[in-house]
C-alpha cells in the first residue's frame, strides 16, 4: 500500500469515527490544521508536499459533502495561523478578510492547496469553529469555541503525524444556584 493510499484510509476511518461520536450538523464549522511534513515523518515545516495536501484535501471535501459542514484550513505560524475559507462563509459570519496568498513555505501545503482549490477562497485571521482536527500538532485550539472536548478515535496517526480531534460544548456558567439539566423540582417555584 502506498503512503498516500494509507493516509487516505486513515483519514477516512478517523473522520468516520469522529462523526459517529460528535454528530456534526450541516453548517457547523470544522477547522483543520495539518503538517504534511509530519505526515511524511519529517519535522513540521520542513518537507511539506502538495501530493499529501491533495490527498488530505480531497478526503476532507468528501467529509464535507457527506455532512454539510463548513471547512476552515489553518495556515502555519508564518501567517499567524490564519485560515483559508470560502468567501461565502466569511461573508455569512462577517469575518474580516485579510490580504495574503498562502504558499507552501509560508502558509503550509494544505492551506496552500485549499487556497488554490476552493471555489472562492479568502484568508481570515480568526474563527471560532465547532470542531476540528489537528494533524501533526499544529495547535488548532486558538480557533475552537470554548469549551473544547477531545474526541478519541481508533486512529492515532495520519501517516507518521500525531492526530487529535475535538468538538466543543457551551460553557457551564453560574454559581451555587446554577442548574445544568432541567428537572421538575428546578422548574417550579414551590
Curated annotation (Swiss-Prot):
One family name in Pfam for this protein: DUF436
Similarity section: Belongs to the UPF0340 family.
Organism the protein comes from: Bacillus cereus (strain ATCC 10987 / NRS 248)
InterPro entries documented for this protein: Antibiotic_NAT-like (IPR028345), DUF436 (IPR006340)
Name of protein: UPF0340 protein BCE_5442
